[in-house]
Amino acid sequence: MTAAITATDDINNQKAVEKTAQEAPVLFNTEPTDCGHLIGIMTLNTPKSLNALSVEMCQLLSQQLEQWQSDNQIVALVLQGAGDKAFCAGGDIRKLYDSMSSDAPLPNPYATEFFGHEYRLYRQMHFYPKPLILWGDGIIMGGGMGLMAGCSHRLVTERTRFAMPEVTIGLFPDASGSWFLQRMPAKTGLFLGLTGAMCNGNDAILANLAEYAVTSSDYGAIIQSLKQSDWQVSASSMDKCDDNSAHSIVSRALAAQPVAELPASKLATYWQPIQQLMNSGGLGDIDVLLQNDAALEKLNVEFANDSWTQRAVDTYRHGCPVTAALTYALYHKVTDLSLEQVLYLEANVAVHCAANPDFKEGVRALLIDKDRSPQWSRSLADCLSSEGQAYIQQHFVNPYAKGEHPLGDWLGDEALGSQLVR
């Protein structure tokens, strides 16, 4: 009887361990290739929150990336989200909200921890030597966009929906948004940052955020193609995969997949009126057009009357004016900055936002009380005044004492921007 009980206990304990492992916020496993190497699979595993990034998830991803970087058996990595709704719908901002009390210090310790880990992860991904393959199926927003931007090979599907909707919560397009929005063609990135417009997979390809259009049912075939690739071509006698060759192998395998027919790109259709709108003058001039239906129709009737545009414009009109001012300022401020300088600057802005009223008010209205009626602290006219501009510029100032900035070591002997970044 004792032996039977012991055996039963062992089985139950094993099941408990397996259940706990499957409940981890990020899952890691490997797939063997036909020629004896391994493909690492990283799965964001919080589908109930649409795989929103937490501090723990950033830490787990960073640790595993470091471990697999030095593992010669690992030739490429795949990053995906659990469930069929989202890859990653942003950051877990509820804990940030809880930390934003009226007597919280500047800089806020939790905001420092959250944004510090998040931005270090993005930097690590951008400079990662091995192929990072993004399975960009479903919703991708905020922090998920930062992960997307950091991957070397990005796949999108007919279900891909991406946005930088921070204007609705009083933050700003963070998560390296200032970096990748600036690099979109025809000032479409500025439009997306100001309006939080929702885009699709074809838009992602046009905006330099993705390279491959596939269907959501192609995942298994893609993994199989990667497993069957000839990784020995890039392996040395020490069984170490050459990273450049590995990138080429992944590119060939993905390019060989059937190209899916995705929904038409709104950015491709309307890039000209978007560019005209964003080039109409300063933020005040852009605002005049965005606030006036007749002015938008005069700019381009089809653009103005498209439900996609109308949703974007409505989001802007109800969004946070301070966010709009920060978005516009950052878009022009980062033009000549390196990725690391942009992340460093964004970390400053993020911590200031956590100390100022609009971010907390936006989260309250959207996620806590859910009344969707935020009371913003300033109008856009206030933001454009001399006092308002000083307030906006204060967000860029380093709020940390000397040596305490979470990304401060990036300003050491190695000059920012000196590394090759994708």
What are these regions (language model features)?
Residues 286-364, 370:
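Substrate-recognition/cap regions that form aromatic- and gly/pro-loop-enriched pockets
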Residues 37, 42-45, 60-105, 120, ...:
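A structural preference for short, pocket-lining loop segments at secondary-structure junctions
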